[in-house]
Amino acid sequence: MKTPPWVPRSSSGNTTLIMKLSTASNMVLALLSAGLVACTQMNETPTYGDFLAEHSKDYPATMEVYMDEAQMAKATPKSPIHICLEQQRGRLYVDGQVAADWPVSTGKEGTETPIGTFRIKEKKKKHFSSLWGTIVDENDICVVESADSRKDKVPAGGEFLGAKMENWQKLTNDGVGIHTGQVRAGKQLSKGCVRTPGFVADALYNITEVGSKVTISRKPEAAWPGNEPPKEQ
């Protein structure tokens, strides 16, 4: 009996990485969770279809990430990136195939993530928001935990500290972008940005360039293999 291709995520709720490696004869699954790496060998290479089938009961609300190493190696700045708000998932396509599928947390009610097709305007490996962050007083004591620099006043001697956003990729002029951030499966948590698990945000950052296209939609994109086939009339 062969080992199942998908490793359950840890009880701590951390993101796990299910990686499809290119050597089919000696498949390795790398689990990245709380600094722990576990490897399992298989005789068959699981596909994205296998990933969806295995998670038929919990997808899209799972913290597991699918990555095809061979496809990721072929990704270019022109490889399409899709963010689905309804599913709270992001997907990268290479040669028309899903190369990666990961959980995201987008804008919550009142600060919803905009829908549309965007071009990356700016990239910064280490970025601090000029809009969102915290405000501390002259004694470095936090006085506003979730501050909006446009509305919240800084007390005399105090300071606004912008939220840290690594792997920053700006999409809109009003400060919406993709970046490393806290993600909870199926939950909209941000002020409008697309929060992404760190290792995924890092991988995307290394693939894209200024001008790369990112599409954000309410429903899953037409190319997604999980879409139900049209019903016969």
Describe each PLM feature range.
Residues 2-3:
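Polybasic, lysine-rich low-complexity intrinsically disordered segments
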Residues 14-28:
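Bacterial N-terminal signal peptides that target proteins for export
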Residues 24, 81, 102, 118, ...:
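A broad, low-specificity signal marking well-ordered, structured residues that form hydrophobic/aromatic
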Residues 27-36:
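Bacterial N-terminal signal peptides
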